[in-house]
Every structure is written in C-alpha cells, then in structure tokens.
C-alpha cells in the first residue's frame, strides 16, 4: 500500500513505495489503488487457505509453517501478506475467519463430488 509511506518515520526510507506510487500516478491508475489491494489481498487469503488445508489433508503430515503473514519491504519488495509491513491488518480477513482454516481444530470435508 503506497499510502503507508507517511508511516515510515525512522531510518528506513520507502523508496520502493515512492517509485511505485509515482509510476501509478504517471499511468493514471493510482485512483484504483484500493481495488488492486483488495483483489491481490483476496487472492493471497485464498492461496494461504488452500496451502494450509492441503497440508492438513496430507496423511501423517506433522504440521505447517508460514514464512510470514506480513508484507516485506527490505532488500526487495514482497507485498504478499495479509498484514501490512507494520503487522497491522489490511482488513482482508478477520482473526476468526483465519482460525476457520488455521486454528487448533479444523474440520475438513472429503467427498468425491460436491
């Protein structure tokens, strides 16, 4: 989210986000920023859900580990998380919704056809 630039108040300069925002303005798509965030975020949530449920369905699987649920803007940029770089919710999914597929007990339904 290039609108988070103002939150960078320490030593890290968000030059990557500055460049992306400038490019979006030049290409006249900045006004669609929230639509892009919502669409890519919804896809990220679906992919996390699919990966976690696939792991849970795997016989004798010992568990799963996620690298990170937050965006990363370090040496490169990876805005792929369901949390922003400050570990705050992007509003893509609630805690309770996430627990439905990544909680202590997750019921899974197996069928040949639905």
Task: Please provide the spans of the model-predicted regions.
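Substrate-binding clefts and catalytic carboxylate motifs of secreted carbohydrate-active enzymes
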Residues: 1-114
């Amino acid at each position: 989210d290039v609108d988070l630039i103002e939150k960078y108040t320490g030593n890290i300069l968000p030059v990557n986000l500055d460049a992306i925002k400038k490019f979006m303005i030049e290409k006249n798509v900045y006004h669609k920023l929230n639509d892009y965030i919502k669409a890519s975020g919804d896809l990220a949530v679906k992919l996390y859900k699919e990966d976690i449920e696939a792991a849970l369905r795997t016989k004798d699987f010992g568990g799963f580990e996620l690298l990170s649920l937050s965006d990363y803007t370090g040496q490169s940029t990876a805005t792929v998380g369901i949390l922003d770089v400050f570990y705050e919710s992007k509003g893509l999914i609630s805690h309770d919704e996430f627990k439905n597929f990544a909680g202590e007990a997750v019921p899974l339904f197996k069928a040949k056809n639905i």
